[in-house]
């Protein structure tokens, strides 16, 4: 186990440790981000955008590594029923991004896309809200939707919001899909919207 910090150069690792990782790692699953829906972009940027920059540097250091990048469907603007597809040009949404988290994920995905165009083997995944494990029921206790459900159960009522859909894709479904896709080089350079 290696403990690092995405917001730091070389993940905050000493040079020897970083070099050893760079020489021995062939595949990177990048799913780290700062998740706080109330923070502005400036507070989310160091870990989400800076961290993505560090992952790209790492993937190019000493030898090329494949990157499986977990983005978010938050890179699409909300508020309507428009279906967004994998091949939508996200540059079309740049001026409609709201919230620091969504803005940072949009920028991070752009960085990954440009790295892919320069030859880095990358596959991108855009999950929606990641929910419980479909078998064990284990869930992130600090996820905002989990907290809303807990609050509703505790107080015995729920918001009246007829158009509010609680979309939660089971974490085990996502993990299985991402690892299966990662095994096939024909998926490099592709984007997958992943909502079950």
Where in this protein do the model-derived segments appear?
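Conserved Rossmann-fold cofactor-binding substructure of NAD(P)-dependent oxidoreductases
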Residues: 1-27
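Conserved Rossmann-fold NAD(P)-dependent oxidoreductase catalytic core, especially the SDR/UDP-sugar
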Residues: 22-23, 27-32, 38-46, 50-100, ...
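Short-chain dehydrogenase/reductase
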Residues: 45-49, 97-106, 142, 164-168
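Conserved beta-loop-beta element that borders a ligand/cofactor-binding pocket
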Residues: 109-137
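Glycine/proline-rich active-site loop of Rossmann-fold NAD(P)-dependent oxidoreductases
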Residues: 133-145, 180-192
């Amino acid at each position: 186990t290696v403990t690092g910090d995405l917001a730091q150069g070389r993940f905050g690792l000493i040079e020897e440790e970083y070099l050893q990782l760079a020489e021995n790692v062939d595949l990177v699953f990048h799913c780290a981000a700062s998740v706080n829906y109330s923070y502005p972009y400036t507070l989310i940027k160091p870990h989400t955008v800076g961290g993505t920059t560090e992952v790209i540097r790492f993937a190019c250091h000493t030898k090329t590594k494949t990157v499986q990048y977990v983005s978010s469907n938050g890179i699409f603007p909300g508020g309507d029923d428009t279906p967004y597809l994998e091949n939508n040009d996200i540059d079309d949404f740049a001026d409609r991004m709201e919230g620091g988290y969504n803005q940072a994920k949009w920028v991070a995905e752009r960085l990954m896309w440009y790295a892919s165009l320069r030859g880095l083997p990358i596959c991108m995944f855009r999950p929606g809200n990641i929910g419980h494990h479909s078998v064990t029921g284990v869930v992130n206790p600090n996820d905002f939707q989990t907290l809303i459900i807990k609050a509703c159960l505790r107080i015995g009522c729920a918001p009246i919001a007829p158009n509010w859909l609680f979309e939660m894709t089971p974490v085990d479904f996502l993990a299985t899909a991402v690892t299966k896709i990662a095994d096939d080089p024909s998926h490099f350079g592709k984007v997958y919207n992943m909502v079950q």
